[in-house]
Amino acid sequence: MIKCAFYLAPDGKLLDQLSMEQIKNFLATGEGLLWVDIEDVTNEDAELLSNVFRFHPLVVADCISKNIHPPKIDDFDDYLFVIVHGINYHIESEVVETTELALFLGKNYVVTSHDVPMRSVSSMLDRVRKDERLMRRGVDFLAHDLIDTLVDNIMPTIEEMDEKNDQLEAEALHEPKRETLMSIMQLKRSILALTRVILPQREIMNGLSRGEYALISERAQIYYRNIYDHLVRIEMLTLGLRDMAESVLSTYLSSVSNRMNEVMKVLTIIATIFIPLTFIVGIYGMNFANMPELAWRYGYFTILIVMAVIGISLVVYFRRRRWL
């Protein structure tokens, strides 16, 4: 479904909400700048991409498919096909959601396609409506602004992951639970998903900033280099976040191990206290006929006192040794 269609005429006038016929006519002129945004490609949209824009069937199939494709760039001489990814991090469910944006860059048009609403695209649509100058600089700058907005939206995700990491570190240190371990492992998976998004896109931006594609002007290349620098910085932050998550996991395992050691120490002390008591009880439980203490009037109470003295003495000894 065509979500929005802009056309910046050669005279600088911006037209919005274009019909299918207007899109065909403006594209045929080869003048001005056309931006068509498609959300959740329908059969009619697929015909527009195939028959009007004449895109290759394979890239049209990529747009129709609901699968997530790896970030990439394909050069078809008269247009570029770029796939980039955005990230949404749901802090409640601790899950990273990857969103895919496909861009077609032609001589006088930009076509964007995505399956779900994207904050970066919605933000650019609002900005263009308020200031048509964003389209006056050309298709390469319009594509840059779209990708730059998408990359900028990754930073809040990293900040949220960092906050979650700090929270899990506190839990792992003071109150480690099974749920804490599950959250740590989910965070590690989210960081891995983020890394898989960033690394390929960094290489794409590197190619766009080095003059490898004729549709990217020399003036725009420096701006793509800026996106590349942002992705390098994000990559460094992500690697740092990964190391911090590993540290939190180690903290959790150490805390659980320490707690287990404390439990084992208490159980060992209890067992040690009862060893001599069990020994005494065992002797007087042998039921030999000739055991004088069994007939003694105060034998029972004497044995209880002896056992109490032994138990208390061991407790005092353990406390002095700081084992209790």
Indicate residue ranges for each PLM-predicted region.
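Hydrophobic alpha-helical transmembrane segments and their immediately adjacent juxtamembrane loops
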Residues: 229-324
